[in-house]
Amino acid sequence: DRSLVLCCDEKSQCQALERTQPGLPLGPHRVRTGTHDYIRHGTITLFAALSYLDGKIFRQTAERHTHTEWLDFIKHLEKQTPAGLTLHLIIDNYATHKHPKVKSWLKWCNQRHHKQHGVDRMVMHFTPTSSSWMNLVERFFRDLTVDCVRDGSFTSIDDLVASIETYLTERDLAPKPY
């Protein structure tokens, strides 16, 4: 009743690749082309939480994907969602999700929230090993890759992040559940 289900994961190794020359467009009897040569400008990790109910995306980017960045992300979720709700996080079995510092913060957060609202704040639900396909946020990552990242040419990490933010801002205008 007072719960929000969020399908969470991180997309690591989002590469800022700058193509060395533009591809040729589609034409009669010609498929679209693209060069395989590129300049690599670095990578980022995109942390995302997809609301199971309405398709809204909570997100944050980071240079790495350790337990520290994961903890920053779930703290971000805690601040971005209404107090009084229990957040049910659907996540995979990646070690960063089970790190002692993450568990310690979750325990503290749940104790504090329980005192104020009578319910835990965050409950982790782990998908079975090798079953990441069960987590709906993976479908979102596929769409992001196909629609925004794969064919893009990015001159910097900032350019890649701006492109992802533009894509997500447009998507947020009419979010949809999967």
Language-model regions: role of each:
Residues 1-75:
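Extended, low-complexity cationic-aromatic segments
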Residues 7-9, 49, 55, 74, ...:
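Mobile genetic element proteins and their domesticated derivatives, centered on retroelements
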Residues 33-38, 109-136, 152-154:
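RNase H-like polynucleotidyl transferase catalytic core
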Residues 44, 92, 119-146, 158:
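RNase H-like two-metal-ion nuclease catalytic core shared by retroviral integrases
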Residues 57, 137-156, 170-172:
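Active-site proximal helix-loop segment of RNase H-like, two-metal nucleases, encompassing DDE(D)
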Residues 68-88:
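Short, basic/hydrophobic alpha-helical segments
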Residues 85-98, 127:
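Acidic/histidine-rich, metal-coordinating catalytic segments
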Residues 172-178:
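Charged, gly/pro-enriched flexible loop segments at helix/strand junctions
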